[in-house]
A protein has these predicted regions:
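Glycine-rich, small/acidic residue-mixed loop/short-helix segments
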Residues: 24, 30-41, 49-51, 55-160
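Non-catalytic protein-protein interaction scaffold segments in large eukaryotic complex-forming proteins
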Residues: 20-22
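Acidic, low-complexity central loop/insert segments
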Residues: 1-15
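Generic recognition of cysteine residues
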Residues: 10, 47-50
Length: 160
C-alpha cells in the first residue's frame, strides 16, 4: 500500500490487517461487519473460527474495543504503530496506522476500550509523552444495541 493510501485509509477509519488490528480483534471493533459499506464478514455464510464470538457480539452488541481516529501532538516526535495508548496512567488501547495529514497534522488510528469518553485525556509514544485527542466524529454510535440485547432487556423489564 502506498503512503497516500495509508493517509486516506487512516482519515476514513479504514483499518489495515496486522497494523490496525491485533490477534484479539473481532470484526465489530473495526467496522468489518454491521457498519456502513462493511462486507468483510457475512453472518449467514459458512463456518469459521470465531463464528460464535462474532454472532454473540452481533446479537448482544457492544464489542469490547472501538477503532477511532486520534489527533496527535505535533510538537514532539511522532509515536509508532503498536505503542500503547494511556489514560490516567492505565493502558486503554494501542496505536495502529500513524500518518501526517496535510490538513489535520499527525493522526493515528487506535483500538481503544469501548465506552471511553471522547474528551478523555490520552497520551502515547514510547515514553508516553505524546498527547492525543479522540476525533469525536470517529466514535461509534452510543445507541448501537443488538437484537439479543434488546430481548434480554425486555425480559428484565427494562425495554417495552
Amino acid at each position: 500500500m502506498k503512503p497516500i493510501e495509508w493517509l486516506t485509509g487512516c482519515r476514513l477509519g479504514a483499518p489495515r490487517l496486522g497494523v490496525d488490528t491485533d490477534e484479539r480483534t473481532i470484526p465489530h471493533e473495526v467496522g468489518w461487519i454491521g457498519g456502513p459499506g462493511a462486507g468483510a464478514v457475512h453472518l449467514n455464510k459458512g463456518c469459521y473460527r470465531g463464528q460464535e464470538t462474532v454472532a454473540r457480539v452481533h446479537n448482544l452488541g457492544r464489542p469490547p474495543r472501538m477503532l477511532v481516529l486520534l489527533h496527535l501532538d505535533e510538537s514532539v516526535q511522532r509515536p509508532s504503530t503498536g505503542d500503547a495508548v494511556l489514560a490516567g496512567g492505565r493502558t486503554v488501547g494501542r496505536l495502529g496506522t500513524v500518518v501526517e495529514h496535510v490538513e489535520l497534522g499527525p493522526v493515528a488510528l487506535a483500538l481503544l476500550k469501548r465506552g471511553l469518553p471522547g474528551d478523555t485525556a490520552l497520551v502515547t509514544g514510547p515514553e508516553a509523552e505524546v498527547a492525543a485527542v479522540i476525533d469525536v466524529d470517529s466514535l461509534p454510535p452510543a445507541d448501537d444495541v443488538g437484537a439479543g440485547r434488546r430481548a434480554v432487556e425486555r425480559l428484565r423489564g427494562g425495554i417495552r
